[in-house]
């Protein structure tokens, strides 16, 4: 929640200094960016790269966070605990965005082992946004020029057209 609060504060500050404001986040940053769109309707552009739309799925299914998962389970938390209504506000896949889908871009990797393609598909269906799929994993997505170029073009067109 702290990241979401800070992103919203920064956006408010920026809106006093410019005419258009967007947000771009990857992975957990994508979670923060996505959650801001469930609260605010005045983003001019939103780019989500491999967004963690279901933190519980990452925690309980990704092999890359095995040690964290083991610690959480040892503390007595189960996947069922994430079904609680209080948790829904932290799950983009259980919330609705306030942003027009034409102002949103999702980029995701076919080979992502952190944020599963099926999780991204569920977010895409719920929010009515298309996904730009690339042949990358979670980390290699950031290192490829093509998705960066695609996203930069989207932001330029959406923010400055």
Where are these regions (language model features)?
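Gly/Ala-rich beta-loop-alpha elbow adjacent to hydrolase catalytic centers
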Residues: 24-33
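Short alpha-helix in the alpha/beta-hydrolase fold that links the catalytic acid
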Residues: 102, 116-125, 146
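Active-site nucleophile elbow and catalytic-triad environment of alpha/beta-hydrolase enzymes
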Residues: 77-97
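Acidic catalytic loop of the alpha/beta-hydrolase fold
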Residues: 110-115, 138-140
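Alpha/beta-hydrolase active-site loop
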Residues: 1-16
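Short beta-strand/loop motif that positions the catalytic acidic residue
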Residues: 99-100, 105-108, 112
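Catalytic histidine-centered segment of alpha/beta-hydrolase-like enzymes
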Residues: 136-149
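Hydrolase active-site cap/lid region
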Residues: 35-80, 133
């Amino acid at each position: 929640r702290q990241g979401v609060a800070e992103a919203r504060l920064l956006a408010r500050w920026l809106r006093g200094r410019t005419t258009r404001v967007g947000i771009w986040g990857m992975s957990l940053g994508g979670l923060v960016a996505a959650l801001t769109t469930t609260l605010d309707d005045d983003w001019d552009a939103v780019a989500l790269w491999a967004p963690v739309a279901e933190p519980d799925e990452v925690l309980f299914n990704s092999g890359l966070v095995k040690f964290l998962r083991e610690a959480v389970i040892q503390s007595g938390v189960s996947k069922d605990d994430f079904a609680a209504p209080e948790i829904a506000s932290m799950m983009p896949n259980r919330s609705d965005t306030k942003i027009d889908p034409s102002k949103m871009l999702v980029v995701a990797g076919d080979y992502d082992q952190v944020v599963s393609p099926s999780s991204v598909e569920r977010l895409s269906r719920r929010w009515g946004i298309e996904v730009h799929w690339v042949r990358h994993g979670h980390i290699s997505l950031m290192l490829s020029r093509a998705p960066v170029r695609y996203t930069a073009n989207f932001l330029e067109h959406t923010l400055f057209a």
